[in-house]
Amino acid sequence: VIDKTFRLTPLTGAILMMALGASGTLAAAPKLLVKEPTQSASAGAQFSSRLIVRYKDNTAAATDRSSKLNAVQAAVGRVGASTGARSSAAAAKATYVRKLGIGSDLIKLSSTLTAAQVDKVVVELKNDPSVADVHIDRMLRPVDIKKSVAGTDVSPQLVPNDPLYAQYQWHLSNPTGGINAPAAWDLSQGAGVVVAVLDTGILPGHPDFAGNLLQGYDFITDAEVSRRPTDARVPGALDYGDWEEADNVCYDGSVAQESSWHGTHVSGTVAEATNNGIGMAGVAPKSTILPVRVLGRCGGYTSDIADAIVWASGGTVEGVPANTNPAEVINMSLGGGGACDSATQVAINGAVSRGTTVVVAAGNDGEDAANHSPASCNNTITVGATRINGGITYYSNYGSKVDLSGPGGGGSVDGNPGGYIWQAGYDGATTPNLRQL
């Protein structure tokens, strides 16, 4: 488990706070489109018929694909026999998808099973002597809603010439709630540091990125989620949008929404060019972003996120070229209800063993972070959100799992060419700011 005692240099403190993005009132200036956090989907809200299974060593299922599938198919059959739902269970087929970078196997069940039946299949597999661990391949997601706001000016100690810096980016310089970024910039601006942003991907054409982007990779393996033509993983991490065209599309209670361009916002918060006379300032303007796409329509699967963690930190993932720019820091401004699962934890442990610091958002639900993932995972730095006056925001998750907190609102680039947006929430601020720590 990570040593929770941190030595915070001015730059480190600045980056940590900035990742959260300050959330308070804004200046009466040109209005920015603003996004504030809403609650994430509860654990199990989104149906998934995909299972992450780890088989015990020295069993046939550990090495033989047929044995892996037979174990799952047998569990499905037992569920059908015990519930009397023979028609739906009998029609369900287990399909082997792939081996994950952490060594577990991803197996997909056909959609004839209900969510309750999938839960029972998991219970059956946990009782199988050949199975070491099994859980549902949950979907995690960024959560934002749009809103207009106005507020008050800030008085920075050092004012870069980025035109929106002084009016909107209080989280960088406000003496009470800010991160004192100007003092940190005097010491370091992140040169030579690679930050992997595991998110919705990137829109690379914005002028304020100023060449701070590596190519990255798209790890989404479901065409319905990625909005690409196939399930194949591809280089580039291009954000195809995560809009939801109607209510209840992703789960009961989900609402229609436009694309968040969340990954572009987070990447800009970290590394958009500073003092270049364009837009806003980045907390670590000389760092380099490695965009890794794991979130799309309705979110992203845990299995894809786990593989992305392995790859971003320099580990090996079958079918994906080696990462020639392993990240010093991984940022995950994403999450969902439920405690940390074993697949995510194993992936994080591997990343830390390779020398990568993993920073995650605590969550925007106003709840104990222990009940959210990856906020509750060990070997991470979990970051909550504070207000302009330094107190915790109304929406920030809290509790013993939260290691650090920083301004919960930040302006950055958005999905429109040359555009900017203000987002409130630790998700867009916490991780980017922590990278500078």
Residue ranges of model-derived segments:
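Gram-negative bacterial Sec-dependent N-terminal signal peptides
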Residues: 2-26
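Loop/turn elements at helix/coil->beta-strand transitions in domains of secreted/extracellular proteins
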Residues: 129-133, 191-195, 286-290, 325-330, ...
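Extracellular S/T/G-rich loop segment that most often corresponds to the catalytic His/Ser-adjacent loop
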Residues: 222, 233, 356, 372-437
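Primarily auto-inhibitory N-terminal propeptides
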Residues: 15, 26-166, 185
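Active-site glycine-centered loops adjacent to acidic/histidine catalytic or metal-binding residues
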Residues: 199, 363
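Subtilisin-like peptidase catalytic core
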Residues: 182, 193, 200-201, 212-343, ...
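Protease zymogen maturation seam
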Residues: 31, 99-102, 126-194, 202, ...
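Catalytic-core regions built around general acid/base machinery
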Residues: 340-358
